[in-house]
Amino acid sequence: EGNTGPEGHAYSRPPQVEGEATNRAIMIADMAGVPLYVVHVSCEDSHEAIRRARQQGKRVWGEPLIQHLTLDESEYFHPDWDHAARRVMSPPFRNKQHQASLWAGLQSGSLSCVATDHCAFTTEQKRFGLGNFAKIPNGTGGLEDRMPMLWTHGVGTGRLTPNEFVAVTSTNIA
């Protein structure tokens, strides 16, 4: 369709593909008899695959990123190309409907912790992808913002209790 900007990154990585990849990884781990830790859970499809596997007694854990809990795909359509490119990461941000599932997973325990995948690039480095989103280096910052963002958007809004906050940032990881 001629999408060459940061929005093309999101279009090229739909949530259904993430969900299918999660299902496949769960199946392979189960066949091999090994546990599975799914990183960067960004969508309902992936979370639901993890939730079902855990209900079946499989040793599967899932980890959303703070970015996927608080930002959405509208970031890629920002009129400032630099702003949009600074948010290119994989998987990409999804529409807001997926966030409700991720928060529910943290509340119920089907998703076990929150991470950042901190991998920052300068604006100059991100500009390598001008005219071709596939050349935008994947990664965003987030390490310094994870705890206050999770407290504000989790505990501060009633999505998480203080005990759930401690669990998804410390206890479950240990």
Residue ranges and their predicted role:
Residues 7-33, 112-114, 120-174:
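His/Asp/Glu-enriched, well-ordered alpha-helical/loop segment
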Residues 1-114, 130:
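Histidine/acidic residue-rich metal-binding segments in metalloenzymes
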